[in-house]
């Protein structure tokens, strides 16, 4: 029972750290960089809320379905009762929290040390330049790609080292998710694996 409480506390702590990173970024950093591309995700979130579907009719694209981006999380914040930039900030923080948690889980399986994996995950989610501020943590247009790429590569490495087929399933799930959203980018990421 004590082990369960210890693990539960650890997972809740990781989630809170991810949420804090998202809130700090969207409240104190990103308002200075918010622009029309970011607002497009907010418009998509409004359409998700109004139509009640993840892929609204007017936003269905052939090569990019944008379902793993920030918009569903903004729509969730809208449902909760937030509006305007507050909905964007809360939704963005929730999205960062989700991707941070997934990233930390995968890295911890690879490293075997939960503290070191938390440090690596935190370093990954600290913006070091304008692209990180805008694309990775602001619009979050590339955040899912980064985490899913980690989710593709590290389990394959673990499979090669330990021959555990469950890690191939995790990698395959990431490929399927990425392919469903962005087929062309997925091809770029998995092309090196095809060569081997």
State each model region's role.
Residues 20, 122-130, 175-181:
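Aromatic-anchored segments of alpha-helical transmembrane domains
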Residues 63, 67, 114-160:
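Membrane-interface micro-motifs in multi-pass membrane enzymes
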Residues 1-6, 56, 109-110, 156-169, ...:
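Membrane-interface junctions at the ends of membrane-embedded or membrane-associated helices
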Residues 16, 90-115, 151:
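Transmembrane-helix motifs of polytopic, lipid-linked glycan transferases
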Residues 167-186, 190-195:
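Membrane-interface alpha helices of multi-pass inner-membrane proteins
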Residues 1-23, 167:
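Start-transfer (signal-anchor) and selected internal transmembrane alpha helices
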Residues 40, 102, 142-163, 167-170, ...:
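Specific aromatic-rich, kink-prone transmembrane helix
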Residues 27-36, 49-72, 79, 85-86:
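Membrane-proximal lumenal/periplasmic loop motifs of glycosylation machinery
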């Amino acid at each position: 029972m004590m082990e369960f409480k210890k693990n539960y506390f650890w997972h809740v702590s990781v989630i809170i750290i991810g949420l804090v990173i998202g809130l700090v970024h969207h409240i104190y950093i990103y308002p200075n960089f918010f622009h029309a591309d970011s607002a497009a995700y907010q418009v998509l979130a409004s359409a998700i809320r109004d139509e009640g579907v993840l892929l609204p009719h007017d936003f269905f694209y052939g090569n990019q379905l944008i379902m793993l981006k920030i918009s569903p999380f903004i729509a969730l914040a809208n449902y909760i009762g937030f509006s305007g930039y507050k909905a964007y900030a809360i939704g963005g923080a929730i999205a960062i929290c989700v991707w941070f948690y997934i990233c930390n889980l995968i890295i911890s399986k690879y490293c075997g040390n939960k503290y070191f994996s938390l440090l690596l995950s935190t370093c990954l989610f600290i913006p070091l330049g304008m692209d990180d501020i805008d694309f990775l943590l602001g619009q979050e247009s590339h955040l899912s790609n980064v985490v899913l790429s980690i989710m593709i590569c590290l389990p394959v490495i673990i499979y090669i080292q330990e021959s555990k087929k469950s890690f191939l399933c995790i990698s395959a799930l990431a490929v399927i998710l990425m392919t469903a959203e962005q087929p062309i980018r997925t091809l770029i990421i998995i092309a090196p694996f095809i060569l081997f």
